[in-house]
Amino acid sequence: MNIIQEQQRINQQVNNIVTRIFKDVEAHKICRFHLSELPESNNWQNHPNIDPVFKKHLDVLNHYKRDCLYWFNCDTKEDAEILNQALNAYRSKKGQNGYRVVPTTNKLDGKEKTIYVGVRRGNTAKNPKLTNIMGRINQHLGYYHQPKTQGLQFLHWAKDLEMYLTLYVVHFDDNLDSILYVIEKAVAKHLVPHCGRH
């Protein structure tokens, strides 16, 4: 087996997938929402996917049962910088009562509008009412009772910011096994998110 040729073949396959993702990025747009729209959790009894007003943004995710790639964008680079500064201020509270684990700062240069890029394996979440991707987005929005589960946790530090976020989700035709994480890194290299290890 020629490892170099195999690596080149895999790289070409990943490049083709990434090119297709960005060729029609609007097809992957799930919703645009204002941070102030995030519903109160009412002691974990309410979640974005069941809130009568907010769920319209996310309903489609409960039909996504295969591997997914997702990212959150701000409207502008300036908004992304403001959001990242607020996240850094929240990070400074680590160790305090009520702190929830958030992603690390991305050390890459050239950051633009993207806050975070992630992937979620297909299948159904532990909660039978959620797909894996819906469960993961709930965690990022801040609606998970375990504070040690890493996520963006927007409800806990960003609800008062005057800005919109857009969620993009790529729902793949098949489950991609280990190549999913290679695609995540390639997309993150393209989008240069403000946080997450890429």
Residue spans for each PLM region:
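Boundary/linker segments flanking structured domains
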Residues: 1-198
